[in-house]
């Protein structure tokens, strides 16, 4: 299918009224990360994913591309309840000019705190052949990450309407 159909990450902000721990209701605008082909699919997917968790009215207030080269998640680790964005600088040698070339990439890390995020990043990068330095690691406001999954279709759903 080529790059035209390459899945990518979208940060979707969802605005709704949330009941806080003290019992007060507050309007919040929370970001979620969704794996999708385009903006239209990202909106439809975030609505599908969060609807079961919403009790009142909500709206998708913003969608933007999120460029993450890699994601290091911590499935099954309940203490890893935050997402951190790390900017990595890769140093390569330009063979023609002989000069060092620096390129940067963002990665997303699920971790409990900053120290844990750096540890998980280093573990995740162990297999990398490229030299890198960590330029920054910052906590994000991302609430959750939704990967693309192929849903099982019911019998007959894949038939065109005129054949049904």
Task: Give a label for each model feature.
Residues 6-44, 90:
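The feature marks the first
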Residues 128-164:
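Glycine-rich, aromatic-bearing surface loops/beta-hairpins
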Residues 63-76, 137-147:
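Short amphipathic beta-strand and strand-loop transition segments with alternating hydrophobic
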Residues 66-129:
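Short, solvent-exposed interaction modules
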Residues 35-70:
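Short, well-structured hydrophobic secondary-structure segments
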């Amino acid at each position: 299918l080529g790059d035209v159909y390459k899945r990518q990450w979208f940060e979707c902000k969802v605005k709704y009224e949330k009941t806080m721990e003290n019992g007060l209701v507050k309007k919040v605008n929370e970001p979620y990360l969704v794996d999708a082909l385009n903006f239209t699919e990202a909106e439809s997917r975030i609505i599908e994913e969060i609807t079961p968790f919403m009790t009142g009215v909500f709206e998708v207030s913003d969608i933007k591309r999120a460029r993450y080269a890699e994601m290091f998640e911590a499935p099954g680790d309940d203490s890893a309840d935050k997402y951190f964005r790390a900017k990595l600088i890769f140093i390569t040698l330009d063979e023609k000019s002989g000069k060092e070339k620096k390129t940067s990439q963002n990665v997303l890390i699920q971790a409990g705190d900053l120290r844990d995020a750096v540890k998980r990043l280093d573990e995740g990068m162990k297999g990398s052949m490229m030299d890198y330095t960590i330029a920054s690691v910052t906590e994000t406001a991302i609430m959750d990450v939704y990967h693309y999954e192929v849903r099982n279709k019911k019998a007959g759903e894949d038939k065109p309407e005129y054949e049904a």
